[in-house]
Curated annotation (Swiss-Prot):
InterPro entries: Aminoacid_DH-like_N_sf, NAD(P)-bd_dom_sf, THF_DH/CycHdrlase, THF_DH/CycHdrlase_cat_dom, THF_DH/CycHdrlase_CS, THF_DH/CycHdrlase_NAD-bd_dom. Homodimer. Substrate binds at Y84, V85, L86, N87, K88, V131, Q132, L133, P309, G310, G311, V312, G313. It comes from Bos taurus. Keywords: Acetylation, Hydrolase, Isopeptide bond, Magnesium, Mitochondrion, Multifunctional enzyme, NAD, NADP, One-carbon metabolism, Oxidoreductase, Transit peptide, Ubl conjugation. Gene3D superfamilies: Leucine Dehydrogenase, chain A, domain 1, NAD(P)-binding Rossmann-like Domain. This NAD-dependent bifunctional enzyme has very different kinetic properties than the larger NADP-dependent trifunctional enzyme and is unique in that it requires formation of an enzyme-magnesium complex to allow binding of NAD. This is Bifunctional methylenetetrahydrofolate dehydrogenase/cyclohydrolase, mitochondrial. It comes from the Eukaryota. NAD(+) binds at G200, R201, S202, R233. Its main location: mitochondrion. HAMAP family: THF_DHG_CYH. GO terms for cellular component: mitochondrion.
Length: 350
């Protein structure tokens, strides 16, 4: 029992260290004379995290363990998905993680895809596994996400990982919400007792962001201790404005260009833009990537702001790499085994 307790304690400390980001906080300053917000470079923060992962990977391999391996399943030929997958495999190579991309046609049946996932789940060479979303309409995305083994689920979409996150337990955190969390913590933006508005309630992004920010900072999986309001597509714009005007932190993950404008936020607020929208540039008539926030207008009033591109996007990829090394170390599996062992010992003693 003493050994089981020690291992469980060690596992908890490892995951809390990886997921809290508390050691990397910097002081939060809002200058009274600043004319514009500090633009947070997600690329620079992502490089910091990838350097940490790179060091962790090399230490893991130097200790006699096999190099971590990430398998990515890409269904169809969606250009955006192809670009995202390429970014992930490049990031894996940069931190010393082996990776493979398994290409399947859009015509693949749901059964065939589930069989492939099962095969990868049972492959001991595969540490991390993700299926790039979105999937063709004839395939149930929720069924696919739940088919991935929870301890290989580097996207953090499996219902077990979602449930553990909601219970403030250590789990594979969804990469984008975790990236937002790391931006906030590493920039030194305070959350304890602060008002936060999250625009967007998707189960993969908006909801987990709100969960990370409002939960108890003293729990197994530390949260932000903030007061969080979530808006969605049925929230009237004027009602949203009432909430954002009081918010210390505004996070937009709605997928609506110019949803958040300067008149909606208070002076010095931190604004995190998770939105990814492709629009036609009114000047060049070429495709342009923008977020949900009127960047030029809001940065004149906010204290901190993330750009699109170059903000949350690079952090998402970096957190995927973090999840992959966690998966390789079988941290969650070890914790689960110790819990089961403790239960078995308890039953035996009775």
């Amino acid at each position: 029992m003493a050994a089981a307790s020690f291992i469980t304690s060690l596992v908890t400390r490892l995951l809390r260290s990886a997921q809290s980001g508390r050691l990397h906080q910097r002081p939060f300053h809002l200058s009274a004379v600043r004319n514009e917000a500090v633009v947070i470079s997600g690329r620079k923060l992502a490089e910091q995290i990838k350097q940490e992962v790179r060091q962790e990977v090399e230490e893991w391999v130097a200790s006699g363990n096999k190099r971590p391996h990430l398998s990515v399943v890409l269904v169809g030929e969606n250009p955006a998905s192809q670009s995202y997958v390429l970014n992930k495999t490049r990031a894996a190579a940069s931190v010393g993680i082996n990776s493979e991309t398994i290409l399947k046609p859009a015509s693949i049946s749901e059964e065939e895809l589930l069989n492939l996932i099962n095969k990868l789940n049972n492959d001991d060479n595969v540490d991390g596994l993700l299926v790039q979303l979105p999937l063709p309409e004839h395939i149930d995305e929720r069924k696919v996400c739940n088919a991935v083994s929870p301890d290989k689920d580097v996207d953090g979409f499996h219902v077990i990982n979602v449930g553990r996150m909601c219970l403030d337990q250590c789990s594979m955190l969804p990469a984008t919400p975790w990236g937002v969390w790391e931006i906030i913590k590493r920039t030194g933006i305070p959350t304890l007792g602060k008002n936060v508005v999250v625009a967007g309630r998707s189960k993969n992004v908006g909801m987990p962001i709100a969960m990370l920010l409002h939960t108890d900072g003293a729990h197994e999986r530390p949260g932000g201790d903030a007061t969080v309001t979530i808006s969605h597509r049925y929230t009237p714009k004027e009602e949203l404005k009432k909430h954002t005007a009081l918010a210390d932190i505004v996070i937009s993950a709605a997928g609506i260009p110019n949803l958040i404008t300067a008149d909606m936020i208070k002076e010095g607020a931190a604004v995190i833009d998770v939105g990814i929208n492709r629009i036609q540039d009114p000047i060049t008539a070429k495709p342009k990537l923008v977020g949900d926030v009127d960047f030029e207008g809001v940065k004149k009033k906010a204290g901190y702001i993330t750009p699109v591109p170059g903000g949350v996007g690079p952090m998402t990829v970096a957190m995927l790499m973090k999840n992959t090394i966690i998966a390789a170390k079988k941290v969650l599996r070890l914790e689960e085994q110790e819990v089961l062992k403790s239960k078995e010992l308890g039953v035996a003693s009775n």
